[in-house]
Amino acid sequence: MGWSCIMLFLAATATGVHSQVQLQQPGAELVKPGASVKLSCKASGYTFTSYWMHWVKQRPGRGLEWIGRIDPNSGGTKYNEKFKSKATLTVDTSSSTAYMQLHSLTSEDSAVYYCAR
């Protein structure tokens, strides 16, 4: 029996009128079913601890699904009930980076994932 992979595409978006605000994600990830993956989102051009960071999922041909958000100042999180056991949100304020770890990956997790301020 052959092995299979799950493709995760990463993207970022920032709100506001300031063109220098940037959220950077590294690109695509290829992982095996059952594995975990940690996605990163590096922020620049604004005070990282002043805005919540949201994570959103989009599968081909489907709408956006809000996964959850984290307050970089306090580390407090709020999750969509559907993703409570799937995703873990964390931040590293020293590098202005937000992370989302996805657990026990399946084909249903193959999607584009956005971080959004």
Swiss-Prot record:
Keywords: Adaptive immunity, Disulfide bond, Immunity, Immunoglobulin, Signal. One of its GO terms (cellular component) is immunoglobulin complex. InterPro entries: Ig-like_dom, Ig-like_dom_sf, Ig-like_fold, Ig_V-set, IgHV. Disulfide bonds join 41-115. Residues 20-49 are annotated as: Framework-1. Residues 1-19 form the signal peptide. Residues 50-54 are annotated as: Complementarity-determining-1. Residues 86-117 are annotated as: Framework-3. Residues 55-68 are annotated as: Framework-2. Residues 69-85 are annotated as: Complementarity-determining-2. Gene3D superfamilies: Immunoglobulins (2.60.40.10). One of its GO terms (biological process) is immunoglobulin mediated immune response. One of its GO terms (molecular function) is antigen binding. PANTHER family: IMMUNOGLOBULIN HEAVY CHAIN. This germline gene belongs to a set of closely related genes that could encode V regions of NPb antibodies. This is Ig heavy chain V region 186-1. It comes from Mus musculus.
